[in-house]
Amino acid sequence: MGARVIDGRPIAGELKKRVASEVEGLAARGVRPGLATVLVGEDYAARAYERRVGGLAAELGCRYVCERLPREAEEADVLAVVGKLNADPRVSGILVLRPLPGHISEPAVFSALDPLKDIEAVHPVNAGLLALGRPRYVPSTPAACFYLLDRYLERSGRPPEEFYPRSTVVVVGRSNNVGKPAVSLGFARGAAVISCDANAYRAGRLREHTLKADALIVAAGVAGLIDESYVREGVIAVDVGINPVADPGGSGRTLLVGDLDFGSVARKAEALTPVPGGVGPITDVWLLKNTVAAGRGLAFRARSGGERGAPGISGGYGGQ
């Protein structure tokens, strides 16, 4: 029996209905969540993502604005835009699109965000809360990985809260936006978690780690990095990679492929995600889910007249 392909689109559709219902509920109380993106330069992937989330925000009934700056903009210009959005009561969530140009400090920009509006948990306070298992917001891509895994497990008759404590989750990639948060989410579910990256590959030890995986999350940004020799029979593999490659058929088109060698891994896996159409659709909706949660929290703060602490939106299993 071949591996099951986990299509993320219907899962994203179900999540989108939940988020839309939350937006309607807030609207009935006079609250309209608002998402703002900050785009510096003309990076193709960042522009494409901005268009997607902007369209989704409009579809769900959220306010949306994109602040665009030229690549030559100074760091002070970006910080000024962030400060303006922090102060705007119509904006509940802010996403600074990456990559930023090399002359602009990501830590400086991320640290300037209002933590209550930092829906990707890049502010040091929010990143720390996530690492402590008390997240204010869970970053959208790692959240999407585990949301997809949880739904797949449930539909195959395995409660996630029973699966993870008996399983090893291996995360390939240690980026601040995917790999490291994914490790924290694995720990929050009670799994044994192994984190590895390019250093393990260069040392010739990546395979010995990935062969231990019951669930494998690959976010290395290397096309076809993981083939069947890196996985054991029955693994559940989640591919976060989005790598543009030339069509091997010679059409001249550019194709998007993941970090898994899909056909090879499918010979041994129980299930795996495609690229595109796996994690990506859920990631987009999760960003708006965080925006709506931020809008709800800011409305509560305005009514109560004070600062609120971290609400623990996704502590343990509750938020996912």
UniProtKB/Swiss-Prot annotation:
Entry annotated with the keyword NADP: yes
Pathway entry: One-carbon metabolism; tetrahydrofolate interconversion
An example Gene Ontology molecular-function term: methenyltetrahydrofolate cyclohydrolase activity
Family annotation (SUPFAM superfamilies): Aminoacid dehydrogenase-like, N-terminal domain (SSF53223), NAD(P)-binding Rossmann-fold domains (SSF51735)
Annotated catalysed reactions: (6R)-5,10-methylene-5,6,7,8-tetrahydrofolate + NADP(+) = (6R)-5,10-methenyltetrahydrofolate + NADPH; (6R)-5,10-methenyltetrahydrofolate + H2O = (6R)-10-formyltetrahydrofolate + H(+)
E.C. number: 1.5.1.5, 3.5.4.9
Binding residues for NADP(+): G173, R174, S175, I242
InterPro entries from the UniProt entry: Aminoacid_DH-like_N_sf, NAD(P)-bd_dom_sf, THF_DH/CycHdrlase, THF_DH/CycHdrlase_cat_dom, THF_DH/CycHdrlase_NAD-bd_dom
A Pfam family of this chain: THF_DHG_CYH
Gene Ontology BP annotations: L-histidine biosynthetic process; methionine biosynthetic process; purine nucleotide biosynthetic process; tetrahydrofolate interconversion
Keywords tagged on the record: Amino-acid biosynthesis, Histidine biosynthesis, Hydrolase, Methionine biosynthesis, Multifunctional enzyme, NADP, One-carbon metabolism, Oxidoreductase, Purine biosynthesis
Complexes and interactors: Homodimer.
Function comment: Catalyzes the oxidation of 5,10-methylenetetrahydrofolate to 5,10-methenyltetrahydrofolate and then the hydrolysis of 5,10-methenyltetrahydrofolate to 10-formyltetrahydrofolate.
Protein name: Bifunctional protein FolD 2
